[in-house]
Amino acid sequence: MRLKDKVILVTASTRGIGLAIVKKCAQEGAKVYMAARNLERAKEIADTLQGVNCVYNDENKPETFSSMVEEVVTDAGRIDVLVNNFGTSNPGKDLDFVNTDPQVFLDTVNLNLRSVFMASQAAVKHMAVHGGGSIINISFVGGLVPDISQVAYGTSKAAINYLTKLIAVQEATHCIRCNAVLPGMTATEAVESHLSDDFKNLFMKHIPLGRMGLPEEIAEAVCYFAGDASAYTTGQILTVSGVFGLATPLYGDIANSKAKR
């Protein structure tokens, strides 16, 4: 098992990508801590999995970032891996640059960036005295490729990408690695329920692999960065998006076109 006996903390982990990460890490032999606001829900999930525990974290309460890390270290003796999975957006109000409300922009950037900064800062202090560790930030391909909307969400993820590299550089002397995984459109409950079929079909025209990603595929990338196989890999921004964002913007129109150059 790739992650045998590693102590892993995953934020925002009761559904979607976060839950897939918890399950995969547990399958690979890790001792996993689910950080969640809804502890009742988290405990229901943890009871069905082997080697999974719960700790409280509310992204709206800054003091809970250090307390969740302290709780993990008190219980397990150390923290080997931190997975920063939290991310919030306000699709109805996070629009294009001109029309996004300034407060929506500030609130979104603040919550998303603060969660990574504060959780990582708390974890680094313990990792540094226990021989190192790995921090994995779940970002978003929109942090690399500007979108026609979601100015706040995309900006927050771009900042997280930068912070990933900064932590990697500044904490390398403590043998602490930091990498980011950038999902594209992923088949989570949120995507399935909040996006129309027309939009999803239009979007998938521009994914060269022709489908949405699966939460389990994001979890596989996380396991790589969490494990010893990536011991010399740090500061990397890994897109798991079916090549979305790399192809020409005309890809969706050209792929099935009979037009000749």
Language-model segments: residues:
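Residue(s) in the substrate-gating loop at a strand-loop-helix junction
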Residues: 140
